[in-house]
Structures are given as C-alpha cells and as structure tokens.
UniProtKB/Swiss-Prot annotation:
Involved in the transcriptional regulation of genes required for mesoderm differentiation. Disulfide bonds: none annotated. This is T-box transcription factor T homolog. Transmembrane segments: none annotated. Residues 355-385 are annotated as: Disordered. It comes from Hemicentrotus pulcherrimus (Sea urchin). The gene is TBXT. InterPro entries: p53-like_TF_DNA-bd_sf, T-box_DNA-bd, T-box_sf, TF_Brachyury, TF_T-box, TF_T-box_CS.
C-alpha cells in the first residue's frame, strides 16, 4: 500500500467561526425564551384573606429611620421552577400611582404631586441563591425586610412617607454558563399600602392590634409589663410578713435601687430570692432620701434572716414616723451613701472597707440601726457607734489597712451576726460602692 503524504493526512482548513456564531445566537434565543421547565411557573400570595381585610380599608405601613418590619408579612408560595437550577428571589416596592396622599375626615385622598423617587433599593431574600427545589418546598417569607424613610443599610428599603406602594417579587435564575436571567416578576393588588410614620386610620390600628399584638407602633410592651409588675408588687405587699414597712425601705422612686423587675433576669437568679422578695413593700410614699449615684437591683444572696435581725428591724420601725424626718438635715451623708442590696458585686461604700459598719445610725436618725454588716469588723466599730450616738454621721476611722484585720475574732464575729440585713445581703459581695 503506498504511503500517504503528510499533506493528504492534514485536515482541510476553512473558517468555522460563522458556525460557532450561529450556535451562540441560537443559545441566546433559547435563553430569552426561558427554560421549558419554567413554563408552568406560578407564584401565589399567602394569607390572601388577611391582606384583603387591610386592603379594603387602605392598608398602612409604618416607616421609621431605623426601619420597621411589615405586617401583614409578605409571604408567597412558588411552583414550577427547575429543581436543579439556582435562583435568587428579590423584593422591591414600586409606586402604585403618581400621587402624594393625605388623610382627611377619615379617608385617604390625593394630596398633590409625589416627591422625588427615592433611590431604588431591592431586598434580597437571605436564602438566595438557592436551588429551585428549596424555593418550592415551603413558602418564601419576607419577614425580615424593614421599611425606612432613610437610606441606612442592608436589609432596609427606603420609601417616601404618604406615598402608595405595591410590593413586587422577582425571581432571577443565576449560576451556570448563562448570565443572570429574570424569570419573572409578580405583584398583588391586595398588598398595596401607604407608607406612614404613624397610623392614621383607627380601623387599621385595630386590625393591627387584633392580628399582630407585638406591633410597636401602637402597643408599648414595656408599659404593659411595668403595669403588670406593679400589680404583682401590690399583691405581694398585701400578704407581706412585714406590712409595717413603708416607702422608706424600698421606695417606688428608686432611692435604694430600681424596681425589682427593671433589669432582665438573665443572670440566672431566682426571682423570689434575697431582697427581691421584698419587691412588694414599695408604696406611694415619696422617699425622703436622695438616690445613690448608681441604681441597683436588690441582691439575691440569701433568702431569709435570723430572729435577732428580725427583732432589730421591728424595734426600729417605730423610729420612722413622719415627724422624725426633720432630722434628715443632720444625717444626709449617712442616708445618701446607704447602699442598696445588690446582685452586682463591688457596689458597697468605700467607707465600709475601713470601718466595721456601713453607716449605722443613731436612735435620733430616721434610719434603723443594725441593718448592714461588714465581713471585716474592726475595733473602729465602737468609734462609729459612739459618733452616731451623738447624731453624727459615721466616718472612716482612718486606721491603716494592716490594723483592720480583726475579722476572725469571736467578738467581731458575734457583733457582725447581730446586724444582718433583710435577705442577708453580704458586704463581701458589695465592696467598693461609690
């Protein structure tokens, strides 16, 4: 067989670029037509009946500087996507008309030309991008989108107040060799609303209250909780073991600390422990004492106190009559620095670190004796007691720290046991109160 030359084996050379261009053009036209698997794409609005109730009254949505979430929450069910293709779902808001609206005599009427259009912002669903199977397995919920009247940051959509908007859901196919492609945009007339900074229609307000009890625009949860706590406090006071206690001890004005429920109980302490058990002893009586520089909640270090302390308290209550308050001028320093039982450490007056007691007052003072103790009593106890016997506010003894070391003596231990505070609030947990 005769050998073939190299030229005969070489493939024929001619230009095929026009063929490649033709194939690319066909692919582009097919992409514009859409994937055959997406021909049956459907998007259905959830909670249609609820949206219709608001739409009938002209729905309103609050916009704030920091952003406010929508109610009703926009949610839609998607069907007809390619389960194996990647999609992103977006939300934006288009102007429903060319009016600025105003609320007059119980109805919304056009109020002039619209303001300039705000910068177009779209909210990308946090699950984007994802497979079509993911978007179709459950409703797509836009509960995290926030409406704002200022352009602040991600997760917020800027709208003009007193303008009507219509939410639009966009589905975009992403990934693969083809470029991003809009599959479809969907909107629903029932979801139209007017952006407001405060609800105008009382009927809309009532619907919001009925179906969304956590809406902040019309229901102040904090005030509601405060009123509930106050009721609990009064109930506890009526069944208190010490009904003779007045507003001087745990005043409602917070002279010795805020209300027991002011701080979030996230520290893990039981609400009934320690001084918090006396949360119901507050009354309407105005506190005669100035508040400390830092308000504290009552301590949870202990649940009860001994018989001696109880007797000491009961015997001292008689000193708190209104006519004895005239002596406050001579005991201002003692009263103002008297610490509250606190669940926070290192909050005891600095004078307690050098003197055995923390401002024990005399019988002429409106403050009862024997309420507080210090874990390091010293020989300066007698000095403080002697000074207060003459109506003077106790002061630090000035002894060096080396001399204040008698905490283990039997005499000091016995003396400290007789001055337990209600709830046994320990000075070791409250050292350094300023």
């Amino acid at each position: 067989m005769p050998a073939m030359s190299a030229d005969a084996l070489r493939a024929p050379s001619y230009n095929v670029s026009h063929l490649l261009n033709a194939v690319q053009s066909e692919m582009n036209r097919g992409s514009e037509k859409g994937d055959p698997s997406e021909e049956g794409l459907k998007v259905r609005l959830d909670d249609v009946e609820l949206w219709k109730k608001f739409h009938k009254l002209t729905n309103e949505m609050i916009v704030t500087k920091s952003g406010r979430r929508m109610f009703p929450v926009l949610s839609a069910s998607i069907a007809g996507l390619d389960p194996n293709s990647m999609y992103s779902v977006l939300l934006d808001f288009s102007a429903a008309d060319d009016h600025r609206w105003k609320y007059v005599n119980g109805e919304w009427i056009p109020g002039g030309k619209p303001d300039g259009s705000p910068p177009t912002t779209a909210y990308i669903h946090p699950d984007s991008p994802n497979f079509g199977a993911h978007w179709m397995k459950q409703a797509v919920n836009f509960s995290k989108v926030k409406l704002s009247n200022k352009l602040n940051g991600s997760g917020q959509v800027m709208l003009n107040s007193l303008h009507k908007y219509e939410p639009r859901i966009h589905i975009i196919r992403v990934g693969g060799r083809e470029k991003q492609r809009l599959v479809g945009s969907y909107s629903f007339t029932e979801t139209r609303f007017i952006a407001v900074t405060a609800y105008q229609n009382e009927d809309i307000t009532q619907l919001k209250i009925k179906y969304n009890p956590f809406a902040k625009a019309f229901l102040d949860i904090k005030d509601k909780n405060d009123g509930h706590d106050l009721f609990d406090d009064v109930h506890d006071f009526q069944g208190s073991k010490y009904p003779q206690f007045g507003g001087w001890f745990l005043p409602g004005s917070g002279a010795f600390g805020p209300t027991p429920h002011q701080f979030n109980p996230s520290i893990g302490l039981p609400s009934h422990a320690g001084c918090d058990r006396y949360g119901g002893l507050r009354s309407h009586r105005t506190s005669p004492y100035p508040p400390p520089p830092y308000h504290q909640k009552y301590s949870a270090a202990g649940a009860g106190y001994g018989a001696e302390a109880s007797a000491g308290l009961s015997s001292s209550i008689s000193l708190l009559a209104a006519d004895s308050w005239s002596s406050l001028a001579n005991s201002t320093s003692a009263a103002s620095s008297m610490p509250a039982c606190s669940q926070y450490g290192s909050m005891w007056p600095s004078t307690a670190a050098t003197s055995g007691f923390s401002h024990v007052s005399s019988p002429q003072s409106p403050l009862p004796t024997g309420l507080f103790r210090n874990p390091h009593p010293t020989s300066s106890h007698q000095h403080n007691l002697a000074s207060t016997a003459h109506g003077m506010a106790p002061v630090a003894s000035g002894l060096p720290s080396a001399a204040v070391t008698t905490a283990n003596s039997s005499e000091a231990h016995a003396l400290s046991q007789s001055v337990m505070a209600p709830g046994e609030c320990r000075a070791s947990d409250n050292a350094g109160y300023l």
